[in-house]
């Protein structure tokens, strides 16, 4: 989820904690729990600091081991030690438990969007993305805002957020069911065996999809149950240009993150351009469609890497051209 929703959930858990009689009857503990749940709801995303090492490092590591099973305990322990050092609590087990719940909830809800996490690492070294909830869901955020207003108006925060989280749990179930129904619609439309990835958007009735069969990739959208195929790509075998370009660390980071990839090669005046596109992120800019998340390598005619790029392109091919230098060695 987005940062704002994680913050909202942190405060929401602080309200829910008032169901704990010890928290409710100990003001200093209630404050410590609020600090712990808010920090815990953000902590796994501190891996965003790896962006300072470049986009490739960020892509490879963001929501990776920081969202893994061992990290749940490491984040919890670090936050607990910090709070105990600043404001020691006699009922420290209660504090520890609520911090742990906040960290776990962060990782759990991140599993449901299209970006996904390595939430099952080390038991499974793959990204898990359940594709049921958009990265920012107005309904979930609005539910928390209603809860905060009721809390401010004098309602019991524990009771308020208990009901809110029951409703949100039901909402998650409904969205998962909608995603399954949409998957079946796409499967019927493609009419071939394959893998089908259905991707949520801000709208409840609008989904995008990527489907892979033995010979093709299909990219499209589902609007109120109507399936539309927008792009079709033939799956081609790897050649020596692609193999040479895959030696780039940026490309390796890109391929470690996504498996919804189509690769294209093009001969240029300086040699070759090899471009991978993540088919999940199709967009339009000034009336032209393009894929926003890409990895591109420039090779000379000896298949030596001249330049490379990985990242997001929001304004089309012109923006990409400005980021690469065919003369660099």
Q: Over which residues does each language-model region extend?
A:
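N-terminal membrane-targeting hydrophobic helices
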Residues: 1-189, 194-201, 210-213, 218
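C-terminal regulatory/interaction regions
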Residues: 188-329
């Amino acid at each position: 989820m987005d940062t704002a929703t994680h913050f909202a959930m942190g405060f929401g858990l602080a309200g829910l904690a008032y169901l704990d009689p010890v928290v409710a009857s100990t003001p200093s503990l209630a404050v410590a729990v609020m600090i712990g749940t808010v920090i815990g709801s953000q902590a796994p995303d501190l891996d965003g600091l790896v962006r300072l090492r470049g986009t490739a490092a960020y892509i490879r590591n963001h929501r990776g081991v920081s969202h893994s099973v061992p990290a749940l305990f490491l984040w919890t322990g670090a936050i607990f030690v910090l709070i105990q050092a600043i404001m020691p609590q006699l009922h420290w087990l209660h504090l520890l438990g609520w911090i742990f719940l906040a960290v776990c909830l962060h990782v759990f809800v991140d599993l449901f969007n299209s970006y996904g996490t390595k939430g099952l690492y080390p038991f499974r070294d793959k990204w898990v993305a359940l594709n049921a909830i958009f990265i920012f869901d107005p309904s979930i955020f609005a539910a928390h805002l209603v809860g905060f207003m009721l809390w401010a108006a004098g309602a019991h925060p524990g009771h308020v957020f208990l009901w809110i989280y029951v409703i949100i749990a039901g909402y998650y179930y409904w969205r998962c069911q909608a995603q399954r129904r949409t998957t079946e619609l796409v499967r019927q439309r493609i009419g071939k065996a394959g893998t089908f990835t259905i991707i949520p958007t801000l709208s409840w009735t609008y989904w995008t999809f990527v489907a892979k069969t033995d010979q093709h990739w299909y990219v499209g959208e589902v609007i109120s149950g109507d399936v539309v195929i927008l792009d079709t790509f033939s799956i081609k075998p790897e050649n020596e240009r692609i193999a040479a370009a895959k030696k780039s660390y940026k490309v390796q980071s890109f391929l470690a993150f996504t498996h919804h990839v189509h690769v294209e090669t093009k001969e240029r005046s300086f040699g070759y351009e090899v471009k991978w596109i993540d088919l999940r992120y199709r967009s339009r800019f000034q009336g032209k469609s393009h894929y926003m998340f890409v990895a591109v390598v420039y090779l000379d005619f000896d298949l030596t890497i001249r330049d490379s790029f990985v990242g997001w392109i929001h304004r089309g091919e012109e923006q990409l051209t400005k980021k690469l230098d065919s003369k660099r060695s």
